[in-house]
Amino acid sequence: MDPDGEEIYIIGSDENKNTVVSILNNYFENITIGYNRKTGKLDIISGTAQTEDETAFVNALNNAKIEVNLEIGNSQNTGHKKSNGEDLMIEGAGGFLGNTISYKSKEHVKENIAKVHTVQYLSIDAMVSFYNEKDWGKLINHEITESFFGGIISSDSNVPGRDENGVINSDIYKKAHAAATPQPYPIGASFFHH
């Protein structure tokens, strides 16, 4: 595995980063992950992906063109601002905060895309409140892969997931959410098919 190709970063307190890595290691059966304590960069310590969720995670990890940044906090306030200056809050435990595109030259065309930098937010406290413990790994993997697929969509379309005013592109979010690994149902949610 090319260590320079690993492009998932976790950002937050050491306690929250350790929590996320521990949850993912409990969730994944065939791979073990670790992280660089200085940079927050995730890596595979051992194993080979064998499930769809593991494969989706490894694909996100090994795509050097998409840099996934999972910001981990405790509240539903992301620490980001809306274009009107108000705090950007999430409704659940995770939130798509879009992405930006960096280019190899001043010409901002698809062929000159150097990297897409994504941002996803995870609230540990909301995750604990809204989801069963057995679903925490599934939720975290969903948030990572949603952010990754948002980056892929932006790379393919040359349209950032967040504009210069901080407005999140809802079309990119919807497509990324649909392409990501499945999200678990919150506690108490019931869905009936008629």
Task: Label each residue range with its predicted role.
Residues 21, 138-141, 177:
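Extracytoplasmic/secreted envelope proteins and their assembly/folding machinery
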Residues 134, 149-194:
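Active-site or metal-binding loop neighborhoods of secreted/extracellular toxin and effector enzymes
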Residues 2, 142-143:
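Acidic active-site catalytic centers that drive phospho-/nucleotidyl reactions
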